[in-house]
């Protein structure tokens, strides 16, 4: 029997029931995804198509990225950060990342987390910390496209350590392994990308990967240096408009 047409809310009435039944699957992608269920959003998507943004974000094309260190670059440095409660953004960090998002840069976190090897933080607890970071960014309209971390540390012989992570690895900055992994996953052109951080290890990783480098908050060994992440974002986005 034919039923009378009725309006449905795609999210609440179709997708959420499928999710509850375990019948909905998804994957994370930095490619262009936009809800265009209103005339205003439809016009925005049309503009993005005409500008070439939709095509440019397709991962079949090489991408440009800004790799960001975490502690002391995005959030306040507190030594070994061990809980989500310690996560606090630096002033203007979210606004800087939002500016990079809006300018079409992939924003990828690349961070050393030896607290895993030290046995002080579990992988699940680190996920909670990063969830808090992403929530704080999201409240300001900003986001990171991916998070890569190194759990290793080469120094051995400490109480509570996890021996499987006490190794010489290729991903602990200043080695470039995290950046290489991201480049493979997201088709990133490293020569057109930047590594930004507050330490010489960040600058070393960026240079080893073939990226341009920018030190912030006092780090001077990069190709460029800026007082804050916000100043870097203004420089990069302003240069593209020039």
Residue ranges and their predicted role:
Residues 63-107:
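Active-site neighborhood of HAD-like aspartate-dependent phosphohydrolases
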